Regions:
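C-terminal region of N-terminal signal peptides and the immediate post-cleavage residues
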Residues: 3-34
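Short pre-active-site segment immediately N-terminal to the catalytic Zn-binding motif
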Residues: 88-104
Length: 194
């Protein structure tokens, strides 16, 4: 059996551009026959979406209106574990648990920051963190304000304490101050720091 036949006979559970908004229920999965033009991609939507909405609600933050798609491979995330594209968040990690939760909150942090921080707030955050650029692709990932903001938001929202090890200056005082600059309120619970 050739690849085209295999793909034609295969089916994928697909929830296309599921918009997750507070108070909504995900629709039932749709069985779609795969064709030569499609890749078989399993998009897993589970209780994690509701959990993320709850994390934002508990912190008093408005959940960003974006589509959230869960994938089994990194293809949709450009070989990363997560990707924010403006109106869609892709989470490309198979494992359940704290790491996947953190990736989801990190990507949602990008969406929240893009919709809620003005230029003055971004500049204040950059100065506080000693960073030179908000989202310059020529700057190392951990030295971009956009990435640090997402990491710090995820750190503050995650219900299981973890340390944002991928960024510098991750002591409790610095992280707490940065979180407060971003959201205008304190961290919802005591967290682990560098």
């Amino acid at each position: 059996m050739d690849t085209a036949s295999t793909l034609t006979r295969a089916t994928a559970t697909l929830l296309a551009a599921l918009a997750i908004q507070p108070g909504t229920t995900p629709p039932e999965p749709i069985e779609v026959a795969a064709t030569k033009a499609t890749q078989v991609v399993e998009i897993v939507v589970d209780a994690q979406a509701g959990w993320a909405i709850e994390r934002f609600d508990l912190a008093g933050l408005e959940f960003p209106e974006v589509s959230v798609l869960f994938h089994e491979t990194k293809d949709a995330c450009q070989d990363n574990v997560g990707l924010y594209t403006g109106d869609t968040i892709h989470v490309c990690i198979r494992a359940d648990g704290t790491y996947r939760d953190k990736v989801l909150l990190h990507e949602l942090g990008h969406a929240w920051a893009a919709r809620n921080l003005d230029d003055a707030q971004r500049q204040t955050f950059l100065e506080l963190r000693g960073l030179g650029a908000w989202n310059d692709s020529g700057t190392d990932w951990g030295e971009r304000g956009f990435e640090q903001a997402a990491e710090i938001l995820a750190w503050g929202l995650l219900e299981i304490p973890t340390t944002p090890a991928q960024i510098s200056t991750n002591d409790c005082e610095s992280l707490t101050e940065a979180y407060e600059i971003l959201v205008g309120a304190g961290v919802p619970r005591q967290q682990v720091c560098g």
